[in-house]
Amino acid sequence: GGYYFPKISGLITSLTASIQNRAGSWRQLSNEGDTPIQTRTYAQMWFNHGLNPTNGKYAYILLPNRTQAQTQTYSQNSGIQILALSNSVHAIKEIVSGIIGANFYGPGNISFINSLNQSSVILKEKDGILDFSAADPVQNQDLLTFELTKNAKSVISKDSKITIVSLSPIKFTVNTTNALGKSFNIKFEL
């Protein structure tokens, strides 16, 4: 697999990498582990943030099962746009498909999406259809609320835990009580 580190203004890009042999036993980590010493080779990567960094930011994309050549090709044209990389939200858009993925670490907004809670969302708008999925990744909230700066003609489908507040503009809630991080989906006709 590979890693891609976007070169974006304001991001830390000084990556250091090393390969090391490390030795130790499970017993050294806990009183219950095995005692034989095991030696393994590990790769390690880190960004040097310096001492006491303020708002240090970096971004990377995991590319599982990609060869070195495929990773190099991807780095020339990733097709990914970083929409937000702030304390309140991290969001990306896959340019060709138009899919947006976002993690809100509290109330925040990106593009046309306003989340009033911590949440994870993934959505796609195509041919007048907005397909929107949301989850409570921290699994401790009972209700997620979303406000979109778009109007909908109708709801095509929705999970039963979603309540429509308004279609113009779009506003809805997601009941995540005991959902254990499950995603809930709604589709709008725009």
Predicted segments — roles?
Residues 63-190:
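Non-catalytic terminal regions with compositionally biased, polar/charged low complexity
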Residues 1-96, 100-104:
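C-terminal (or distal) subdomains of carbohydrate-active enzymes
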